[in-house]
């Protein structure tokens, strides 16, 4: 079966009820033939608000969660709470969580495991920084992180892998469609050799670098690029156009 195209809009720590409400209205009203899966990730404070306002045909994701269901963990939210808001996805291991907040591969693996066991879909992020890329260790870094995640996954049907070329985010550098395809292809091969052929064929590997309306068509035409995790650009109304690039 062909893999269902996946577009995630990560709103990060941006917006308020007024601006996000307007964005959601634009999203809901978009007349776009709908073949893929669109998921938007509002700030935690607006999970309820977003799920209430966003058309049910779109998914909503949290941007993070913790590795247990409840307890003395000030400032954290659990998958159970996310589900209680009617939200079905969570983004884990985003480069900002790793590099700004110091989350380790191990912690992210534990979060992935717990979120999946609670029935959430997980967008698990992996990628390498500029110094790692320049040192020629991209594959080693990316496979190592994927392995930690893979060790914690029993059921892959609810996992989307997002490759973030961290070296290209907000730096003005972009990964060419060929560079992206090469890495996505190697990731799929790694899954085939280390998990199973079935998983390798069915898991969506999406691109989490800088995406613009101009680059998304070219990227989406690559055989192993199954969608996007869009950052800042997802706060603009044109975001809705990204979801139609395969048609």
Curated annotation (Swiss-Prot):
Q: Which organism is it from?
A: Latimeria chalumnae (Coelacanth)
List the protein's name: Triosephosphate isomerase
User: What are the record keywords, sorted?
Assistant: Cytoplasm, Gluconeogenesis, Glycolysis, Isomerase, Lyase
Q: Please give the pathway this protein is involved in.
A: Carbohydrate biosynthesis; gluconeogenesis; Carbohydrate degradation; glycolysis; D-glyceraldehyde 3-phosphate from glycerone phosphate: step 1/1
Biological process terms in GO annotation: gluconeogenesis; glyceraldehyde-3-phosphate biosynthetic process; glycerol catabolic process; glycolytic process
- List the record's Gene Ontology CC terms alphabetically: cytosol
Q: Where in the cell is it found?
A: Cytoplasm
The active site lies at: 94 (electrophile), 164 (proton acceptor)
Q: Where's it mainly located?
A: cytoplasm
Q: Which reaction does it catalyse?
A: D-glyceraldehyde 3-phosphate = dihydroxyacetone phosphate; dihydroxyacetone phosphate = methylglyoxal + phosphate
